[in-house]
Swiss-Prot record:
It catalyses: tRNA(Arg) + L-arginine + ATP = L-arginyl-tRNA(Arg) + AMP + diphosphate. Transmembrane segments: none annotated. GO terms for cellular component: cytoplasm. It is found in: Cytoplasm. One of its GO terms (biological process) is arginyl-tRNA aminoacylation. Keywords: Aminoacyl-tRNA synthetase, ATP-binding, Cytoplasm, Ligase, Nucleotide-binding, Protein biosynthesis. This is Arginine--tRNA ligase. Monomer. Its EC number is 6.1.1.19.
Length: 556
């Protein structure tokens, strides 16, 4: 708990004690005290409606209760310099903001650790995200999912969760069979042998490139192989080729994974048979019309689901059930799946499966990533200028830059459609939120360098003996909110709350800079204190930007 949270907690405790001392209510009847931050500063730094909450118990008008509480409130004990009552009984508290200066040395001491909280209490959480089919380049939906997923993992870890990042490789099923046939056709064509592409094949330049590469490296030695042996070989070549590309794109996007989990492994290690047997033993499987069905309606699904088709092949659902059973058996207390917008209808059947396996369905959380539209020059961008094909993650990174791509994908709630303005993303103006935030960091670093050139040290015995300016107080308060912002973004699974915080902190810094002088040769002690404040801003901004995968430049 940081200094601001400690102060708020002490204020809540003093309000509760004042209620008890006033005789308005006994300790057992005092509700949980809630502190709000008034939108209008004229109404104080904090406000509570506890008097209105107590009206029924005390059988008195809320305003009279508020007056009783205020009479018995000890403000000096909790840095309160003034209290007043507003409206029907709101109690407003005006803080003596000297306590805020204690934040600065605390942030300087914490450094990279500033913002860490223990709201997660070590809970084991698995976050599965991206999980794109290994049959082509990552598109914009995958890119947004990657940015949101990685940012969420960073935030959860900062908030005290034990996080595992996982990518599920869809390396079984028809799409991989079609990939193998596509590689085979391009290989034959590269050798000058006529071979038609499969009807549902993959026609991208990457498969043509792989076919040529195989022909150059191996000649025609695969032509004489048995077809099944050849297709198995091309399956492996194609899968490795596509996964290498995906891994490189994600690494360049600053997205990492702890586990790359192969769907095929579920078949080889008997986990699919195990999941099917578990459901059968629990009475949730039946046979009908030559197919094997999961009685998912028992658990709230709108209809029962086929697991094994009449021809003996599995539907997508069965390996997915086996995969989630494996997740749960690995001891994860919370499973967070980040899925594309087209998977929304899949959630009830997956929760039904988890319940049928004997687990709490609420262990599964699904965050839906809505679609992305690109705009340039006011027009919707449908194709990449470079390739003439659909825009990929790689295209976007090269067009607008890595930092802008990461920030823009994280700055809106993932369950809302995102209009990505490419012109805004590259503009060097205050309207560009990532430029605005990075410029704030660079501006602070510039001030720190200037202070260093003057030989003004800001560590050790800091002294904020002067009266704090209004914008300085605002900036200190915003610094103090960082751990709470991390905790809220983690608990609500909302990385966009962190970009909101970054924008607010950058705004507070720019406002302070425009209103106040940081470096003043006529007042070295004040300059030292404000340089320490700037260092605290630099640490906090850097830590916050890192959570959403964005670089904090020292110069711009």
């Amino acid at each position: 708990m940081n200094i601001v949270e400690q102060m708020k907690q002490k204020l809540k405790e003093e309000i509760k004690e004042a209620v008890i001392r006033s005789g308005v209510a006994t300790e057992a009847d005092v509700p949980s005290v809630i502190l709000e931050t008034p939108k209008d500063k004229a109404h104080g730094d904090y406000s509570t409606n506890v008097a209105m909450q107590l009206a029924r118990v005390a059988k008195k008008a809320p305003r009279m209760i508020a007056e009783d509480i205020v009479r018995h409130f000890n403000g000096e004990a909790v840095f309160v310099k003034k209290v007043d009552i507003a409206g029907p009984g709101f109690i407003n508290f005006y803080m003596d903001n000297r306590y805020l200066t204690e934040l600065v040395p605390a942030i300087l001491q914490a450094g990279d650790a500033y913002g860490e909280t223990n709201v997660g209490q070590g809970q084991k959480v698995q976050v599965e995200f991206v999980s794109a089919n290994p049959t082509g380049s990552l598109h914009l939906g995958h890119a947004r999912g990657a940015a949101v997923g990685d940012s969420l993992c960073n935030i959860l870890k900062k908030a005290g969760f034990d996080v595992t990042r996982e990518y599920y490789i869809n390396d079984a099923g028809n799409q991989i069979a079609n990939l193998a046939k596509s590689v085979e056709a391009r290989y034959f064509q590269a050798l000058g042998i006529k071979k038609d592409m499969p009807e549902d094949g993959y026609f991208g330049e990457d498969i043509i490139e792989l076919g040529k590469k195989l022909a150059e490296e191996h000649g025609d030695k695969f032509v004489a192989l048995d077809e099944q042996e050849r297709l198995q070989l091309f399956r492996e070549y194609g899968l490795a080729f596509e996964m290498d590309k995906i891994k490189k794109d994600l690494a360049d996007f600053r997205v990492t994974f702890d586990v790359w989990y192969s769907e095929t492994s579920l078949y080889h290690n008997g986990k699919i048979d195990k999941a099917l047997e578990t459901l059968r033993e629990k009475g949730h499987i039946y046979e009908q019309d030559g197919a094997t069905w999961f009685r998912s309606t028992t658990f709230g699904d709108d209809k029962d689901r086929v697991l094994i088709k009449q021809d003996g092949t599995y539907t997508y659902l069965l390996p997915d059930i086996a995969y989630h059973q494996d997740k749960l058996e690995r001891g994860f207390e919370k499973i967070i799946n980040i899925w594309g917008a087209d998977h929304h209808g899949y959630i009830p059947r997956m929760k039904a499966a988890i319940a049928a396996l004997g687990y709490d369905p609420d262990v599964l959380e699904v965050e839906i990533i809505q679609l992305v539209s690109l705009y340039q020059n006011g027009e919707k961008v449908r194709m990449s200028k470079r390739t003439g094909k659909a825009v990929t993650l790689r295209d976007l990174m090269e067009e607008v830059g890595l930092d802008a791509t990461r920030y823009f994908f994280a700055m809106r709630s993932s369950d809302t459609h995102l209009d990505f303005d490419m012109d805004l993303a590259v503009s060097q103006s205050n309207e560009n939120p990532v430029y605005y935030a990075q410029y704030a960091h660079a501006r602070v670093c510039s001030m720190l360098r200037q202070g260093e050139e003057q030989g003004w040290r800001y560590d050790g015995d800091l002294s904020f003996t002067y009266e704090l300016a209004e914008k300085e107080i605002d900036l200190l308060k915003k610094l103090g909110e960082f751990p709470s912002a991390v905790a809220e973004a983690a608990v609500k699974r909302s990385p966009h709350r962190m970009t909101n915080y970054i924008f607010d902190l950058a705004s507070a810094l720019h406002s302070f800079y425009n209103a106040e002088k940081v470096l003043d040769a006529a007042n070295v002690e004040k300059s030292r204190a404000r340089l320490a404040l700037m260092k605290a801003v630099q640490i906090t901004l850097k830590n916050a930007l890192a959570l959403v995968g964005v670089h904090a430049p020292e110069k711009m």
